Amino acid sequence: MRKVLVVDGTFLKSKYKGVLLVATALDGNSNLYPIAFAVVDSENDRSWNWFFRQLKVVVPDERALAFVSDRNNSLCKGLENVYPLSQHGICIHHLLNNVVTHYRGKGVVGLIAKASKAYRVVDFQKRFEAVCNISPAIGEYLTDANVTKWARCQFQGYRYDIRTTNPTESINSALRSPREYPVIPLLDSIREMLTRWFFERRTRSRKHTMPLTIAIEKKIDRRINKGKTFLVQPVNEHRFLVRGDTIDCLVDLDRRTCSCGKYDLLKIPCRHAIKAGLTVSRAPSSLTDFMYTTSNWRTAYEETINPIGVPDDSWVVPNTVRNASVLAPESRRGAGRRRKRRYETVEDKLRSSQGAQEKKRRRCSRCGEENHNRATCDRAI
């Protein structure tokens, strides 16, 4: 399991509103692995502090731990108070949306996205300098946002390939209907979802016979194909110079590093490391971090998520709970109909525009020509 937690909040749509706070990780097969849920009145300082204190009971604070979130002030304060040792990264989607909303600059969004994805510091610096040349104001804003929080190669810890809050967005999407339920049915729906996920993945991992998880095996196969034409020059027993890509790369198989940066940051051998390993009969699985192994994947789903087997009328409720005074949640209904679909991000718009350009042109079903349809066709048949 990668030690990266994605945290976010999403609005509930029941009578009393409120917010569902979520913390999730990704397993070795890149599937969602929810860690914690909480229902609170709103995303304020007290709510996030309380949530992180409960989370700390099962996920201790350490320097190897990383969080990825948006730039919500209360969330950031809660992390600083409860998880001072951990590293905090921000979602690149939210950062790009802020840039588009408040600044102008032709082509700057694509450059920022590429800079955030760079594995080498030199590549990041080239792209970031290009952004600053186009718009010094945007460069200043990105610097103030703290480069170490949004640029992968500048991050103080390891965030692997988790650059956005998409994992929590995916959970929110899976709970689209339950988010309209009252609290108890909502929590039971979450439990049912987790029970189903754990059973399906437990079954799937037990059937899988390869040393690495399904997603990583596919990734390794693609990299093997990309590196077929590379030339390997040994430096010593475990260091190799790999030529044939856009840059020559120095690979150290024992230290599990490559000068391209990808092996160092993802802990999965890059195509250069795979090619070097194959020349000395070292399988890619032996060069991959344990978190991506099938055995570790199976361990993650050994336990089961059990339903509550006691009928409601047989529950033993402690007097402290029975006598507690439960206040109505703080909520205000907004004007108009509540939006159910999430707002489209900048990268969503970029992808949709690219898809529109590649879309197949429509033809008239009568004559087969373009730029009109059957109803307006005046061609002679």
PLM features per residue range, with description:
Residues 1-34, 41, 45, 154-155:
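An active-site-proximal beta-strand-loop segment
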Residues 64-74, 94:
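Acidic/histidine-rich, metal-coordinating catalytic segments
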Residues 56-58, 64, 80-89, 96-337:
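Hydrophobic, aromatic-enriched, well-ordered structural segments
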